[in-house]
């Protein structure tokens, strides 16, 4: 610890000031961080989007496709085919792609459901490759569509398939392609797409769960992908989906290219379901932008992809989804031709690239489609938000050195096994979850969703007893110091993996962490315990879902009668159960890290705080 003292044994003045005023720093830095995050949505504090890679040239790309007539005819034929054969019409699709002059292949895969009897499901994808006539075929672009018929709860995508078929015929007649174009029609939503990507790259993302099979043919390295989900031949607007697995984002240049083409084709659009705010520096404009900002934080924090494009990001493939919902009668609608031209423009722009996307941002927020917040801005706000914990940890270390100058390291080493024990408990919960679900279902006849919820709640609630085993067994200052470091070791890496989730954890956790273990009067200690209990990962996630349910039910956080309260509570409990099931399924099938973070990060850190 020579860095904390000078050669004559005196402590540097700066460290002395830090130790004396650490509490003041904590009181200042946290609200400054919150204010900075709120201010990032204000126009003067963010930047206008721009193209970093001029080779994309969306304004120079000629978009000549006119697919409306042929695509509508194909759509009618496809609807008749699906009415007779509800599954993926592989024979019909293969015939259409072959008539367009493409190589057509089928891809079989299987899913072994990871719970219960591990029931085996089978599926089939179909993909067609249009080989580039001008190069050695070492690079490719993917256009994917998930197959959904009219009975799907997510809406039919037959219009997307018809549009893609006609685009394939148009593309095949052109000679300027320098990259192969792969058209992929997938079955079983994200499972089919994940299986195809695994088979294409010769990997297994989820060994023993998704069995990807093999592909008869493939192309080169995939540069970019467009996932198309049109629910009708006439739509109101395009919803651009950008969030991927674990909060990953496509390169900002690809998003800017898509936005530019939508504007040029006069296609109304929204970004992740939110309209652009007014071009104004007024409070109303900031409020709209801040609402978009908070909405993006909420979507990204879940770690789940907002659409099928999100599975491409793991393989360094820049991708986004264009989703169109059926038009509302009486309002202006958009046909297939302008949407087809947007897709054509995107593919042609990527076709111009000489190397992978790398010049623009991969870490950003978009308060509107033409304004962005770069990592330099939001990480500064995050630093202020969590900086108080770091300074307080350093101040505690100095205090521990003053009180026990010869044995402070020994005290820290004695406290370390408790931290490792908490992590071991979290690892046990994570590794035994499938067995725990089977045990609960054996004892009580419950569905998998309910059995998982019962096991998770029971196992997590047992951590409330940890203070009984640790009280007075570890030096309180050493335990507080390690708790601060434990918290920082969670949120610091999380800020790079998923900044939105890290921000939510920091915003909820910093006040509770800083006040844990501090000597104070009994009434304040009781309030602190209540606050710690509310910030339990299980309870806090339930409260957030309840608030969302109330807003969805009433349009605000105000509940007017008991019926609204009952409906909101019922929706929150149902959503909370589904949250854990989906998080665990996403981990086993796609590698989403939300459930591992819950078991290995959030619960151990909260339990550590609870013992103080």
Report the location of each language-model feature.
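A non-catalytic alpha/beta surface segment that caps or lines the substrate-entry region
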Residues: 2-23, 66-133
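Second-shell loop/turn segments in exported
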Residues: 62-64, 75-88, 113-116, 146-158, ...
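Acidic/histidine-rich catalytic neighborhood of metal-dependent amide-processing enzymes
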Residues: 150-253
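Non-cytosolic juxtamembrane linkers/loops
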Residues: 292-294, 304, 310, 314-446
């Amino acid at each position: 610890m020579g860095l904390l003292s000078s050669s004559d044994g005196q402590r540097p003045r700066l460290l002395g000031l830090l130790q004396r005023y650490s509490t003041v720093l904590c009181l200042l830095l946290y609200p400054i961080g919150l204010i900075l995050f709120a201010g990032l949505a204000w126009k003067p504090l963010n930047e206008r989007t721009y193209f970093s890679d001029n080779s994309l040239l969306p304004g120079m790309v000629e978009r000549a496709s006119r697919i409306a007539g042929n695509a509508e005819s194909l759509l009618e034929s496809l609807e008749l085919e699906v009415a007779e054969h509800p599954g993926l019409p592989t024979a019909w699709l293969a015939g259409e792609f072959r008539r367009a002059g493409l190589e057509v292949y089928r891809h079989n895969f299987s899913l072994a459901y990871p719970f219960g009897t591990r029931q085996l499901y089978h599926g089939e994808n179909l993909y067609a490759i249009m080989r580039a006539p001008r190069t050695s075929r070492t690079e490719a672009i993917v256009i994917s569509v998930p197959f959904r018929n009219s009975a799907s709860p997510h809406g039919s995508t037959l219009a997307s398939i018809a549009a893609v078929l006609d685009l394939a015929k148009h593309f095949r007649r052109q000679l300027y392609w320098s990259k192969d174009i792969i058209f992929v029609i997938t079955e079983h939503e994200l499972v089919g797409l994940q299986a195809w990507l695994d088979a294409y790259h010769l990997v297994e993302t989820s060994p023993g769960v998704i069995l990807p099979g093999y592909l008869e043919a493939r192309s080169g390295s995939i540069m970019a992908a467009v996932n198309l989900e049109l629910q009708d031949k006439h739509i109101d607007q395009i919803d651009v989906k950008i969030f991927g697995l674990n909060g990953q984002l496509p390169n900002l240049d690809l998003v800017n290219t898509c936005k530019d083409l939508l504007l040029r084709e006069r296609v109304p659009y929204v970004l992740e379901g939110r309209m652009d705010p007014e071009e104004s520096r007024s409070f109303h404009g900031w409020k709209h932008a801040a609402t978009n900002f908070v909405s993006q934080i909420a979507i990204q924090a879940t770690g789940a992809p907002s659409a099928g494009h999100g599975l491409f990001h793991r393989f360094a493939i820049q991708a986004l989804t264009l989703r169109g919902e059926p038009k509302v009668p009486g309002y202006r609608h958009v046909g297939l031709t302008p949407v087809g031209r947007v897709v054509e423009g995107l593919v042609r722009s990527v076709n111009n690239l000489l190397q992978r996307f790398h010049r623009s941002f991969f870490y950003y927020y978009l308060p509107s489609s033409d304004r962005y917040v770069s990592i330099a801005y939001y990480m500064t706000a995050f630093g202020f938000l969590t900086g108080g914990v770091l300074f307080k940890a350093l101040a505690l270390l100095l205090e521990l050195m003053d009180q026990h100058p010869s044995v402070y390291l020994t005290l820290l080493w004695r406290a370390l096994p408790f931290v490792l024990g908490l992590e071991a408990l979290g690892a046990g919960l994570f590794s035994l979850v499938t067995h725990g679900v089977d045990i609960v279902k054996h004892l009580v006849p419950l569905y998998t969703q309910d059995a998982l919820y019962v096991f998770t709640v029971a196992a997590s609630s047992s951590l409330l007893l940890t203070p009984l085993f640790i009280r007075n067994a570890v030096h309180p200052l050493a335990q507080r110091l390690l708790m601060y470091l434990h918290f920082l070791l969670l949120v610091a890496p999380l800020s790079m993996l998923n900044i939105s989730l890290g921000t939510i954890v920091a915003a909820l956790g910093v006040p509770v962490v800083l006040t844990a273990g501090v000597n104070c009067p009994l009434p304040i200690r009781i309030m602190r315990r209540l606050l710690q209990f509310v910030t339990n990962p299980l309870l806090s996630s339930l409260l957030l879902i309840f608030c969302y349910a109330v807003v969805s039910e009433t349009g605000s956080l105000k509940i007017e009668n008991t019926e609204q309260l009952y409906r909101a509570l019922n929706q929150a409990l149902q959503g909370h159960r589904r949250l854990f099931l989906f998080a665990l399924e996403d981990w086993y099938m796609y590698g989403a890290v939300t459930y591992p973070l819950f078991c290995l990060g959030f619960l151990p850190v909260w339990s550590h705080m609870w013992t103080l």
